[in-house]
Amino acid sequence: MFDKIFWVMKMKKLLLCILSLMLCLNTSVIHAKEPESLMIVAHPDDETIWGGSHLINGNYTVLCITNGNNKKRKKEFMNVMEKTHSKGIILSFPDKTKGKRDNWKSCKKDIQREIQKEIDSKDWDKIVTHNPDGEYGHIHHKKVSKYVTMILEKEDKTNQLVYFGKYASKKNKAELENEKKLSKKDYKEKLDVIQLYSSQSKVMDHLHHMLPYENWKPYSNWGKIE
């Protein structure tokens, strides 16, 4: 009798494992059918804050410029890549040096070379990055946006370039009234991914009002009043 119960329990576990594997494979196949796009961000978490729902529902390679030498941040980033079925590349250019935000003067050309290498590695459907304002003005966001834009303008590929959406501060969030929000389902899925960035809880709290919005803008429409 005991052997029979034990056998039934083992079979149930096996079936659950098979179903789980089939679900993962099915999700991966769906992602693989989407045209492949490239997202380029300054820090681990930027890809999720400004484009998490796109990652979940699309087929992306994400190039992150900083924190590849930070074990915690790198692990969080790679966990997000796994969760969203994305390919992640995380470099180790400086985020902060001696407690202060690095100005990238010493590594500007190296960063540009790495960005160009990834841009030229495939014929991407879209190349997505920080907007020229750096969202809320972060200097690294602005620099990444500038480098990506400069390369794509030089290569005459700006038709592929897409920027993260406009930012509004908490006190000015009324500016977002006419912006389209993510569906409840997509927003919930995005929040589930956000949880993987436990080290960035303060950042997520500060930018929480922006999480329901991912209204990206093509290069050709940036700055136009709609």
PLM regions: where:
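N-terminal Sec-pathway targeting helices
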Residues: 12-14
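Metal-dependent de-N-acetylase/amidase catalytic core
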Residues: 32-37, 58, 107-226
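Active-site rim/loop-helix segments in enzyme catalytic domains that contact anionic ligands
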Residues: 30-122, 149-158
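Bacterial N-terminal signal peptides
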Residues: 17-24
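Short, Lys/Arg-enriched N-terminal segments with co-localized hydrophobic residues
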Residues: 1-10
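General helical structural elements
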Residues: 16-17, 77
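Cleavable N-terminal signal peptides
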Residues: 20, 29-30
